[in-house]
């Protein structure tokens, strides 16, 4: 048996230079430091007669590349193969039950290792510094992953933790900088401090539903982690648990959390959103450094444990608060018996948006919010809103997608309210004392809806007929009947009798004649020519244009007839009469008794000559017409 003396502290075969060594079958154990520091030999065969390998038996055998371990070995001592920096692979026989601390630590070129189901115990630091190890499967027989077992395994990309594991100790995966994802099974009850610290490529981690605490530094500097959900089983998030997770954008705090310790999320420079499910008052345990240097802008409440709203750190950072309290949450329903309304949010100095998805029987209280340029979205029915809920608030947009009617003048009493949107199923045209400007479907709360009160959007709605009051383009500045503005009558005076465009049958406000009809003048309200929904209106416009052409043609024909009639009248009646007057000569006026007497012939002549004194023959023609 190759064992040192009781007092010996030196290796039995120290500084062995032989390239290969075979241990004889008579050997049953390899003792303490037997081949310690044998840096030259490259291979070793351990026979089936050997049952145990002692502490540091092969430590520092830096050229050793091949090891054959017999099937009778049951345990490896501490540091048995530590610092064997040239070993690339090891197969552990099914006879082994225990691998002790540091057994393979520092084997930097080890890329694969097979651990059989016979192994029930893996010691701490067992594979520490195995920087070439890329993957490992932990057998179902292992119940504990001890401290620093894979510390510094920087090439490890995947690992499977079996359902048999109940605890993960401190620094178990510290510095596994290539590990991208890991699933902690429900069998795990806790994991210690720094368990996943410096896992810089870890982007996804699922924490089991039975973990009761997250240790300090557990995920410190996991700089690729983007989101984390703390399961409902967790009660404590220890100090610096997620310290400097620089890409973490959102977290969900589970229902049972009662304590969050200092710097838990400090220096998470991208953390903007927190979802709170806990019903416990955790503000007393939170110090100001818990979220230090976190640009949090959004709080989402899925619980009635609303005391978290009083946390001072949030007051000048949060811009959006959302409430979504599930009706099926029994804990929430118990809490609902204790409170009747949401708390006021007036201490949030930069808050500008509130979304309420579900608050069950809670109401919105007086002085709920204050500030300017608010957007409020309520996606479901709520019990009531206090008439003075928004009295110190100017609202850009208020959206209510519930169907139950809301009483009180809560919008009218606000400092201002620019836009009011409801569901298409909301029966009234007013809400909160304000007229509804748009209605939209519940499925798409962010899209602008239709304004039931705006003219010009539905061609069948009242108020869209261009002849309706308020839309007559004959208003000052818009009358196409002004001289030179009617494209169908260039150079004509529409003020003459028979040509007034406001007379029946010639009204330019009829469909098709008004150049300001919807679809022709994009500056008119409600006449967006790019809207495909107005195809019916466009068809009406085309029909109107055809009618306008016909009417214009008729007017032109009438003008031609009038001119012809005037020419006829002149040549057939007026010109012959003038010739007769020349033959008769000038007659003397007869004056009797101080009175001018006019002969019948002069009266007739005077009547006949009158048209020649008119300055505008067209005027006479029009009168005759």
UniProtKB/Swiss-Prot annotation:
Topological domain ranges for the Cytoplasmic compartment: 572-625
Ranges annotated as biased composition (Polar residues): 588-625
Signal peptide: none
Primary location group: membrane
Glycosylation positions in this chain: 15, 227
Subcellular location: Cell membrane
Pfam families the record matches: LRR_5 (PF13306)
InterPro entries in UniProt: LRR_5, LRR_dom_sf, Surface_bspA-like
A GO CC annotation given for this chain: plasma membrane
Keyword terms of this UniProt record: Cell membrane, Glycoprotein, Leucine-rich repeat, Membrane, Repeat, Transmembrane, Transmembrane helix
Glycoprotein among keywords: yes
Extracellular side: 1-548
Disulfide cross-links: none
Its membrane topology: Single-pass membrane protein
Transmembrane segments: 549-571
Function of the protein: May bind host tissue.
Name the UniProt record assigns to this protein: Putative surface protein bspA-like
